[in-house]
């Protein structure tokens, strides 16, 4: 992610939450617009039960005399990532607020990002960062266990999107094959005409 682009769309699947948050926070502070999709597929190192206990401990933290005064505990995976990123930038300053304006986070892959090229961040990928065999937790599963209600809805929409995506890819593949065949035949006919002009 060193090159500056108009908007970078990151596929969150298989990335470690904290590592991705640190990289994204640096990029948005530098002026890069970033969109993170499939936040429910983000990973946290450590087994599920341990992470659930940690989250319940975090849920206990509240203003003693009035819980409505915060701190507010987000349950949705996209908001968990958002809060992790927010904690890594000076969000109370004008510069930090402007940086957060450049960030968008989503569960699933909503339009128009389903038609955009998605990238991964190798420095934050679980398979490259955690030792093989280490336990990890999916943020979607953790969120669902602590009160997020839309896991089934997101799963249904994702299945629908994957079917449409597979159909689109098959059509594109067939069209590319046809185009390449047409180009090859045109090149052959042009070569034949030139040879005929020289009497071959």
From Swiss-Prot:
Give GO cellular component annotations, separated by semicolons: cytosolic large ribosomal subunit; membrane; ribosome; small-subunit processome
The protein's matches in InterPro entries, at most eight in alphabetical order, are given as: Ribosomal_uL13, Ribosomal_uL13_CS, Ribosomal_uL13_euk/arc, Ribosomal_uL13_sf
Question: Which top-level group of life is the source organism from?
Answer: Eukaryota
Matching CDD domains, A to Z? Ribosomal_L13
Family annotation (Pfam families): Ribosomal_L13
Annotated compartments: Cytoplasm
Q: In terms of one coarse class, where is the protein primarily found? A: cytoplasm
Would you indicate the residue range of the signal peptide?
A: none
What is its quaternary makeup?
Answer: Component of the large ribosomal subunit. Mature ribosomes consist of a small (40S) and a large (60S) subunit. The 40S subunit contains about 32 different proteins and 1 molecule of RNA (18S). The 60S subunit contains 45 different proteins and 3 molecules of RNA (25S, 5.8S and 5S).
Task of the protein: Component of the ribosome, a large ribonucleoprotein complex responsible for the synthesis of proteins in the cell. The small ribosomal subunit (SSU) binds messenger RNAs (mRNAs) and translates the encoded message by selecting cognate aminoacyl-transfer RNA (tRNA) molecules. The large subunit (LSU) contains the ribosomal catalytic site termed the peptidyl transferase center (PTC), which catalyzes the formation of peptide bonds, thereby polymerizing the amino acids delivered by tRNAs into a polypeptide chain.
Q: Which NCBIfam families match?
A: L13_A_E (TIGR01077)
Q: What is this protein called?
A: Large ribosomal subunit protein uL13
Source organism of this protein record: Candida albicans (strain SC5314 / ATCC MYA-2876)
Q: What is the lineage of its organism?
A: Eukaryota, Fungi, Dikarya, Ascomycota, Saccharomycotina
Q: Which gene encodes it?
A: RPL16A
């Amino acid at each position: 992610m060193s090159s500056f682009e108009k908007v970078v769309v990151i596929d969150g699947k298989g990335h470690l939450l904290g590592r991705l948050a640190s990289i994204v926070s640096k990029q948005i502070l530098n002026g890069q617009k970033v969109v993170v999709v499939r936040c429910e597929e983000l990973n946290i190192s450590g087994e599920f039960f341990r992470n659930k206990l940690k989250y319940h401990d975090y849920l206990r933290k509240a203003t003693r005399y009035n819980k409505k005064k915060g701190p507010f505990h987000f349950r949705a995976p996209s908001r968990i990532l958002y809060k992790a990123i927010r904690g890594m930038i000076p969000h109370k300053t004008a510069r930090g607020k402007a940086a957060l304006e450049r960030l968008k986070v989503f569960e699933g892959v909503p339009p128009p990002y389903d038609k955009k090229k998605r990238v991964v961040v190798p420095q934050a990928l679980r398979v490259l960062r955690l030792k093989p065999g280490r336990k990890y937790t999916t943020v979607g599963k953790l969120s669902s266990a602590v009160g997020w209600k839309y896991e089934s809805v997101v799963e249904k929409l994702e299945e629908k999107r994957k079917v449409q995506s597979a159909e689109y890819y098959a059509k594109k593949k067939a069209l590319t094959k046809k185009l390449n065949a047409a180009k090859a035949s045109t090149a052959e006919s042009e070569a034949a005409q030139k040879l005929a002009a020289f009497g071959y």
